[in-house]
C-alpha cells in the first residue's frame, strides 16, 4: 500500500509543526503504477504543503474510488469516463491566486525565494501522473489552502463497464 508505506517518510519530512492525516478506504484500491514514482508525487506535494504552512497546519491525504462521467472527463481534457482512484492532498496553507495556480506545472516556475526551490517539483508531479494515464485537478484560494486531486485509472476489470446484471453475470467491485 503506497500511502501507508510513505506515511513515515512524510511525517519526518514535514516536521512537527504540520499535522499529517493519511487515510484510505478500507477496501484495497488497485492501479497499474510505479509505486516509487507515486511516492515521489506524494513527497513533492507534501513538501510544497509544508512550505505553504510555515507556522504549522494540517496536511490531509485521502484515497478513494470515484466514477468519472463523460461530461467531467471532457471538461478536464481526459480520455475516458470510468472508475478512477482518487488521491486527494489538501493543506491549510497560504493558498495561491489564480495567476499562480495556472502556472504551477510549468517547469522552472516557482514562487519560492532564490535557493529554496527549482520549480521542477510540480512539473514532475504533472509528468508522472500523465505517464500513468491520470490527471490532476487543483483548487486553491489565498489564505484558505490548496487541494490537489489526482485521478488514476483503476486496474483490471474496472477499466471496462460493469456487465449488465443477469443470472450468468454479476458485477463485482473493482477493489476485490
Region roles according to the model:
Residues 1-176:
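Core catalytic ATP-binding domain of two-component histidine kinases
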